[in-house]
Structure formats: C-alpha cells, structure tokens
Amino acid sequence: MKNTVKLEQFVALKEKDLQKIKGGEMRISRIILDFLFLRKK
C-alpha cells in the first residue's frame, strides 16, 4: 500500500511538471505516466 501512495504522489508531481513544461520533456513525462498507469492496473 505504501508503494501505491508513493506512486500517486509521484504522478501528482508529474502532472504539475506537465502543466509547467511543454515540448520534448513533456512527451517524455507522458510516456513515464502511461507506463506507471499500465503497471498500476
């Protein structure tokens, strides 16, 4: 359960980054988020 909480916090941080950063870095973060969501399921 602790890992799940850490993941949610990490995703929340990434979402903030996505709002600030636009361009190549945003695409990389998007891929990481997609990967995390796939693992979560």
UniProtKB/Swiss-Prot annotation:
What keywords is this UniProt entry annotated with?
A: Competence, Pheromone, Secreted
Q: Which residues form the propeptide?
A: 1-24
Q: Does the keyword Oxidoreductase apply?
A: no
Question: Secreted as a keyword?
Answer: yes
Q: Where in the cell is it found?
A: Secreted
List the record's Gene Ontology CC terms alphabetically. Answer: extracellular region
Its domain of life reads: Bacteria
Biological process annotations from GO: establishment of competence for transformation
Primary role: Acts as a pheromone, induces cells to develop competence for genetic transformation.
The record's NCBIfam families line, in alphabetical order, gives: ComC_Streptocco (NF033214)
Similarity comment? Belongs to the ComC family.
Q: What is this protein called?
A: Competence-stimulating peptide type 2
